[in-house]
Curated annotation (Swiss-Prot):
This protein's UniProt keywords: Acetylation, Cell membrane, Hydrogen ion transport, Ion transport, Membrane, Transport
Gene Ontology CC, one term: plasma membrane
Gene: ATP6V1G1
Source taxonomy: Eukaryota, Metazoa, Chordata, Craniata, Vertebrata
Function: Subunit of the V1 complex of vacuolar(H+)-ATPase (V-ATPase), a multisubunit enzyme composed of a peripheral complex (V1) that hydrolyzes ATP and a membrane integral complex (V0) that translocates protons. V-ATPase is responsible for acidifying and maintaining the pH of intracellular compartments and in some cell types, is targeted to the plasma membrane, where it is responsible for acidifying the extracellular environment.
Complex and partners: V-ATPase is a heteromultimeric enzyme made up of two complexes: the ATP-hydrolytic V1 complex and the proton translocation V0 complex. The V1 complex consists of three catalytic AB heterodimers that form a heterohexamer, three peripheral stalks each consisting of EG heterodimers, one central rotor including subunits D and F, and the regulatory subunits C and H. The proton translocation complex V0 consists of the proton transport subunit a, a ring of proteolipid subunits c9c'', rotary subunit d, subunits e and f, and the accessory subunits ATP6AP1/Ac45 and ATP6AP2/PRR.
Keyword Transport belongs to the record: yes
Protein name from the UniProt record: V-type proton ATPase subunit G 1
Length: 118
């Protein structure tokens, strides 16, 4: 009977060691998966940064010529605004006088299409 209990004890210890080994193997597997995932994320991030850098370079090359066009348009706009402001200052008083004359000087007249029936 003692040999049977000793055999059972050995089986229990063997089962315990096997469970520990399985547990360690699972932990190692999880660590490897986690490490692989982190490496993949780092590689993805590096690739994304590289592609973004290439895109920015192409975008800058494409927009470089457009930037000079926008400064030219801005310059022309400023010149035209200056001319319009000059015209405004020159003609403001005359336009106001004409407007006030039309509004204030009312001459009552009979419309040419009005017929007097009589």
């Amino acid at each position: 009977m003692a040999s049977q209990s000793q055999g059972i004890q050995q089986l229990l210890q063997a089962e315990k060691r096997a469970a520990e080994k399985v547990s360690e193997a699972r932990k190692r597997k999880n660590r490897r998966l986690k490490q692989a995932k982190e490496e993949a994320q780092a590689e993805i991030e590096q690739y994304r940064l590289q592609r973004e850098k290439e895109f920015k370079a192409k975008e800058a090359a494409a927009l470089g010529s457009r930037g000079s066009c926008s400064t030219e348009v801005e310059k022309e706009t400023q010149e035209k605004m200056t001319i319009l402001q000059t015209y405004f200052r020159q003609n403001r008083d005359e336009v106001l006088d004409n407007l006030l004359a039309f509004v204030c000087d009312i001459r009552p007249e009979i419309h040419e299409n009005y017929r007097i029936n009589g």
